[in-house]
Design a protein with these regions (language model features):
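A conserved regulatory-domain signal marking ACT and ACT-like small-molecule sensing domains
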Residues: 1-87
Length: 87
């Protein structure tokens, strides 16, 4: 069964950071649906929406947390749901 996760990452910017994160996601057969990245001064921040087998979530989290100087947060989300906001 697939799970949708939103991954946030932040830490000092450096060369190869996106490649390193992407490689780990690929190694764990995660499918990147969308991502946003930004550099603020010397800091890097990234949001990624992925699909991954639900039983691989913890293994992926452990692998990401091995990257030096980056902090990760993984949140399970639901499929695209339309939400109507009233003003």
């Amino acid at each position: 069964m697939l799970s949708k996760l939103i991954i946030s990452a932040n830490g000092p910017d450096r060369k190869g950071i996106v490649s390193e994160i992407s490689s780990i996601l690929d190694e764990h057969n995660a499918n990147i649906e969308t991502s946003k990245m930004i550099r603020l001064e010397k800091e890097f921040a990234m949001l990624i929406l992925i699909d991954i087998q639900i039983d691989k979530t913890k293994i992926l989290e452990d692998a990401l947390n091995k990257i030096d100087d980056l902090f990760f947060n993984l949140i399970e989300t639901k499929s695209n749901q339309n939400i109507l906001y009233k003003n």
